[in-house]
Regions:
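C-terminal and late-domain segments of enzyme folds
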Residues: 12-50, 156, 160-275
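Catalytic nucleophile loop
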Residues: 111-113, 134-153
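Charged helix-capping and loop-helix junction motifs
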Residues: 71-73, 124-129, 197-200
């Protein structure tokens, strides 16, 4: 079995995360600095990382300049605290969106920030981001909404008051087309949420899953997609045709490519080895 197929260096490495730096809606102190090392994510990042990487953070809040400036500094420190070397951490928002999108291929690591899915999607469309990603060979990390917007067709799960009850709200919208997998983040925190009097999962998401497949993941879990391989690392659930089932647990890996649970690799180098 293959945990991840790495036949070539020159291809996009896509990390779809829920939260790579903490637990959503939790004030509990972290026992690590930098990115969450759970389920081998830091090891995998280090395996793909290039020294002195040029990094770009694309904001989900394109008009919140002061927030974005602070976030840029925070992620610069997070990368450093993880033990990854970088030469820059730039921000992309409404001040420079098209300029940074045009320069996308000059970066080695691109973060798609978390926030409100439709708002972020509209910004991505405005700067032509989907086209700019064509042929990109670096690392892309989606965070929450950023992971959701990576899909070819995005499931914009209702989140804000009014969205579930509004018949004009679009639940399926065009995405970046980096993956065909629909990620639902923060399952640990939102599984009991209620939006407009409807249970987020049972009354909204399950019915929306008919003819679709969603993957609900908890914070610390991630999907790693490379050429010919897509593997979920950590606790995850599949929602399809209204049926909810757990497919993976913490410390294990599940191949979406092969549809089977597989052992967790002992080291990043074992990603290249078949068993």
């Amino acid at each position: 079995m293959l945990v991840c197929v790495l036949q070539e260096d020159q291809m996009m490495k896509l990390f779809l995360t829920s939260s790579p730096i903490g637990i959503y809606r939790s004030d509990e102190p972290l026992d690590y600095s930098g990115f969450n090392p759970d389920n081998g994510m830091v090891e995998a990042l280090k395996y793909f990382w290039v020294d002195g990487a040029r990094c770009l953070l694309i904001s989900a809040f394109p008009d919140e300049y002061s927030v974005n400036d602070r976030m840029r500094k925070d992620y610069e420190e997070i990368v450093k605290d993880t033990g990854l070397s970088l030469s820059c951490m730039d921000i992309c928002d409404s001040r420079n969106g098209k300029e940074k999108a045009d320069a996308l291929h000059s970066y080695d690591f691109v973060i798609l920030g978390g926030g409100h899915v439709p708002t972020e999607s509209a910004f991505f469309a405005r700067i032509g981001l989907a086209d700019r990603f064509r042929g990109f060979e670096g690392i892309v990390m989606g965070i929450s909404a950023g992971s959701m917007n990576c899909a070819r067709i995005v499931y914009a799960q209702p989140e804000l008051p009014g969205e579930a009850a509004d018949p004009s709200y679009s639940r399926f919208i065009p995405g970046l087309g980096l993956t065909d997998y629909n990620i639902l983040p923060h399952y640990n925190a939102v599984k009991n949420d209620v939006v407009d009097g409807l249970r987020l999962m049972e009354d909204i998401t399950y019915p929306d899953s008919f003819g679709k497949t969603f993957y609900a993941i908890v914070d610390g879990t991630y999907l790693l997609q490379t050429e010919g391989s897509a593997v979920i690392h950590g606790e995850a659930y599949r929602i399809h045709d209204g049926i909810f089932e757990q497919i993976c647990v913490r410390g294990k890996a599940f191949s979406l490519t092969d549809g089977e649970l597989i052992p967790k690799p002992e080291s990043p180098g074992s990603l290249q080895a078949g068993m």
